[in-house]
């Protein structure tokens, strides 16, 4: 049984802490909204909202909604892009990047768009946000949500991480990897996830996350910051994933998240031998959220550049003049870059 495997693993790792950490203060998952700074400040929103709110500890812009029958998709503020409907603890990862206006930011696994909307709000219309989603149908949802949220400086991609890494090595100041995962933190919110859970899924997601993390690291500029997050408890996808990455990437340092104001440290016994792993952050059900894991990685300013990508020459595609005008106006720093290579769009 899936839940038997999960509980046996977690009890072995946590011991007598299992019942404490998995005891949620509420019976059902919290409902919440995250306010976009492109539309309103949290203070203005709280003063004008016509439904009961409580500030969330996970993000200054996030609120818990205390109204069981609240339908966010029917509210005018939703359609005006004032808020994104999001479980409150899911808003915790994006602010850890420390995005500032003018930066080049990548959201690697961006759909449906909650974290991208947070990153766009931090950019305040300056710089560029590249929001990528590998699954085409989800990329359409991502695009729709960013349009609704009033984001004007984003490029939505439907690409593999490897192809983006080939095109844009060491390009981004900040990278968010909210990795595809086994979803153990969502069992309460999505009960069907528990019925589909097994160790093979965990191992598959761990391997996929490792591949995505490698490509993300290649796209991060020296001195840049990468945040890796999941909504699972599995060590292979969390602490052990980060420990394995650090063992092969001495140019990266694990930043300490213990002053972030929420959650608890990473678990040492989930990555034996990596004493720094407690610098990561976990949110347990006992903390008032669903299950989340976060690690913040900083790339050395002196990191060596990756080997140049060699692309087989081909007949250049004719670039539409409308696209050139758009790039020159919106992203002037991209104007001198090739827009296509062997017929493939780079951006």
Feature names for model-found ranges:
Residues 1-347:
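S-adenosylmethionine
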